């Protein structure tokens, strides 16, 4: 009888231990589930914050990639690019635009570039000179250069180029920034290097600092970025819009074909 009683006590204690273990496991699970909901966040707020963070990361990655090499594009992206070239977006020249050529021309070419974009640097060094000679120097078109800001480096470099505010200074720094891209864009000391570039072009460190703190310049750059970011199927930088229609890529043949077509249409309409 005594042995039976001992066995019953043993079974009772085992059962209690198991219940306590289950309760502890349940509490730990609740804690784990509640960990993301810190700082008095609701589940909906926490979920939205995660979504926003993911979207921001995807946006920066997409914008800074800038790789338009055909071999890495999937079939879906090929289809998106085909759709993009038929999409028309309204672009009007405003007082903040940097314009080359004939401002009064009805054929407006808008280039979107990022100061840290390698393809943009390549375009300006190898393709742009021929287009400039054919269309800009002859005053056939209005050529608008707009920045697409994807990184802090892009912003600081674009501010330097716009610091003095005139077109000649802008082009001077625009060219130097792209030519020297590999020396400053990927350095931890990019701000110092941009400051040095500014001094060589006649902008003192104090002037550059004032421009960096200028809300007007920053707002212009962000507005330029937001405008094209809303364009359907925007394919990254460099991108070109001829009278609002995006070209397929930045080859001289594609851009020239689009410009010639626009000039022809303009002649017929007169």
Swiss-Prot record:
- Record has Disulfide bond as a keyword: yes
Q: What's the domain of life for this entry?
A: Bacteria
Which GO terms of the cellular component aspect does the record hold?
periplasmic space
Key word Lyase present? no
The cysteines covalently paired via disulfide bonds are: 117-120
Among the GO molecular function terms of this UniProt record, one is: disulfide oxidoreductase activity
Which residue positions does the secretion signal occupy?
Answer: 1-17
Return the broad EC class. Answer: oxidoreductase
Q: Where in the cell is it found?
A: Periplasm
Which residues does the UniProt record annotate as the domain Thioredoxin? 71-264
Main location, first listed in the record:
periplasm
Its EC number is 1.8.-.-
Query: Which terms are listed as keywords in the entry?
Result: Disulfide bond, Oxidoreductase, Periplasm, Redox-active center, Signal
Q: Which family does it belong to?
A: Belongs to the thioredoxin family. DsbA subfamily.
What does the function comment of this entry state? May be required for disulfide bond formation in some proteins.
**Name of protein:** Putative protein-disulfide oxidoreductase RT0103
